[in-house]
UniProtKB/Swiss-Prot annotation:
It comes from Bacillus subtilis (strain 168). Coiled coil: none annotated. This is Spore coat protein F-like protein YgzC. The keyword Cell cycle does not apply. InterPro entries: Spore_coat_CotF-like. It is found in: Spore coat. GO terms for biological process: sporulation resulting in formation of a cellular spore. The keyword Repeat does not apply. Belongs to the CotF family. The gene is ygzC. It comes from the Bacteria.
């Protein structure tokens, strides 16, 4: 059951990202430096979520932190793909 819920969350993130790109195209509104800064911020968040997830003992908090970690990793992947696609990172 968890995997199907997680898969549906990932699909909804993908749909949201597609809609966001259509309504607010990232490549037209931000320069490569802005996106690289965002990528660095997300990487820092991933590190902090990892530490917090392993440090907490409460399973509900751990689950919430893990979900946030998954979202941050997914967003990092999407932004990295965008940077590579545009040739801004290589």
């Amino acid at each position: 059951m968890y995997r199907s819920k997680k898969q549906s969350q990932i699909l909804s993130y993908q749909e949201l990202l597609k809609k966001q790109r259509r309504w607010f195209p990232i490549e037209q509104s931000l320069c490569p430096k802005d996106i690289l800064d965002l990528l660095t911020t997300i990487k820092t968040s991933i590190n902090k979520y990892t530490v917090a997830t392993t440090a907490t003992e409460n399973p509900h908090i751990r689950r919430a932190l893990h979900d946030q970690l998954d979202t941050a990793v997914y967003l990092h992947d999407e932004l990295s793909d965008l940077l590579l696609e545009k040739g801004w990172l290589g």
